[in-house]
Amino acid sequence: VGFKAGVKDYRLTYYTPEYKTKDTDILAAFRMTPQPGVPAEEAGAAVAAESSTGTWTTVWTDGLTSLDRYKGRCYDIEPVAGEENQYIAYVAYPLDLFEEGSVTNMLTSIVGNVFGXKAXRALRLEDLRILPAYSKTFIGPPHGIQVERDKLNKYGRPLLGCTIKPKLGLCAKNYGRAVYECLRGGLDFTKDDENVNSQPSMRWRDRFLFVAEALFKAQAETGEVKGHYLNATAGTCEEMIKRATFARELGAPIVMHDYLTGGFTANTSLAFYCRDNGLLLHIHRAMHAVIDRQRNHGMHLRVLAKALRMSGGDHIHAGTVVGKLEGEREVTLGFVDLLRDDYIEKDRSRGIYFTQDWVSMPGVLPVASGGIHVWHMPALTEIFGDDSVLQFGGGTLGHPWGNAPGAVANRVALEACVQARNEGRDLAREGNEIIREASK
């Protein structure tokens, strides 16, 4: 009989160092720490097997399909320099393993089950290569960077935002008042915090109404287009779309979603709604550190960012890089480019394991936020460039004279830095001097 039952090593089937990757493969780079006594080849093969067609034993139904066509393959393993017992395992997945247009299915396949496999003590997905034939099946950002600039009529500089604090406890009217002060002072956007949904102290409908009033008042007074990220995240997809619909009816230009806690299915639904109804979509990454904080286990933020670009979003939070280590800066800039650019070359020093070609998929604006203030402005302008949103929460609202003067300070600092850069001055060296001159 042709079928031979029993358990055999994964590497006999799934470790294929002679394999030449195809243009139709999705490629993954896993950082793995094998269990003591498990060879790296076996651990890499186990990862490839468990995230594609394999199971722990041979099954007779394997004979009813073409394993060679469908199996994932671990095609290369390299030790991580400076780390004991850590390896990068490269795995190629045939395109037929994935449903078109579903980030949910892609992540369920690649990382859904394999992180509990016995052979690996720890596992981290560092990067994915998404081929154009697959990325073309996704909606991508509802509008993208250029369309957003045209809608807002704002060019040649980063955009400015501010998260309204305290995040919970204000009534809707005072919340709207804080929004108005910031926008009147010169910010482009204000923002609901990620956990502001519809709590007893401030129901979503009341908040939306007072914020819309603040928006239009600030627009009339400044002559600029203003926005507030109205958080449409809700307990059900239906409720989320209901909130986005109300925002559209009020004439708001942008809504917001917590894409990891809300889930990729909900996010893609909202992205379709936003594209069909002319709403921009701001994405918050709440819960990301649960997944990406550990250096040897989980998923790197660049994978979550790639997944978001496919699922749909016009802005996404991307950390700040200010005051971090040099290496961190390069890695952060690497995935910022993955969000914005059409074509990104492989560059291991920036954490980019594969060349990524997004073809014509629109870009996402990276949002720098978290503990930044006016004195960081020269560094932020230099690092992030024009296509970004700089978001100052306490850096605006913490101004001793209040919200509007805080917003003015940010806008003046930004305009000064952009002008200095355009004049060819060195922001890194002269930054503090530029800010001092501007504040007179």
Swiss-Prot record:
Binds 1 Mg(2+) ion per subunit. Substrate binds at residues 113, 163, 167, 285, 317, 369. Transmembrane segments: none annotated. GO terms for molecular function: magnesium ion binding; monooxygenase activity; ribulose-bisphosphate carboxylase activity. It is an enzyme of class 4 (lyase). Keywords: Calvin cycle, Carbon dioxide fixation, Chloroplast, Disulfide bond, Lyase, Magnesium, Metal-binding, Methylation, Monooxygenase, Oxidoreductase, Photorespiration, Photosynthesis, Plastid. It is found in: Plastid, Chloroplast. Its cofactor is Mg(2+). The active site is at residues 165, 284. GO terms for biological process: photorespiration; reductive pentose-phosphate cycle. It catalyses: 2 (2R)-3-phosphoglycerate + 2 H(+) = D-ribulose 1,5-bisphosphate + CO2 + H2O; D-ribulose 1,5-bisphosphate + O2 = 2-phosphoglycolate + (2R)-3-phosphoglycerate + 2 H(+). The disulfide bond which can form in the large chain dimeric partners within the hexadecamer appears to be associated with oxidative stress and protein turnover. Its EC number is 4.1.1.39. Mg(2+) binds at residues 191, 193-194. The modification N6,N6,N6-trimethyllysine is found at residue 4. The modification N6-carboxylysine is found at residue 191. InterPro entries: RuBisCO, RuBisCo_large_chain_AS, RuBisCO_lsu_C, RuBisCO_lsu_C_sf, RuBisCO_lsu_fd_N, RuBisCO_lsu_N_sf, RuBisCO_lsuI. GO terms for cellular component: chloroplast. Belongs to the RuBisCO large chain family. Type I subfamily. The basic functional RuBisCO is composed of a large chain homodimer in a 'head-to-tail' conformation. In form I RuBisCO this homodimer is arranged in a barrel-like tetramer with the small subunits forming a tetrameric 'cap' on each end of the 'barrel'. HAMAP family: RuBisCO_L_type1 (MF_01338). RuBisCO catalyzes two reactions: the carboxylation of D-ribulose 1,5-bisphosphate, the primary event in carbon dioxide fixation, as well as the oxidative fragmentation of the pentose substrate in the photorespiration process. Both reactions occur simultaneously and in competition at the same active site. Heterohexadecamer of 8 large chains and 8 small chains; disulfide-linked. The disulfide link is formed within the large subunit homodimers. NCBIfam families: PRK04208.1. This is Ribulose bisphosphate carboxylase large chain. The lineage of its organism: Eukaryota, Viridiplantae, Streptophyta, Embryophyta, Tracheophyta. The gene is rbcL.
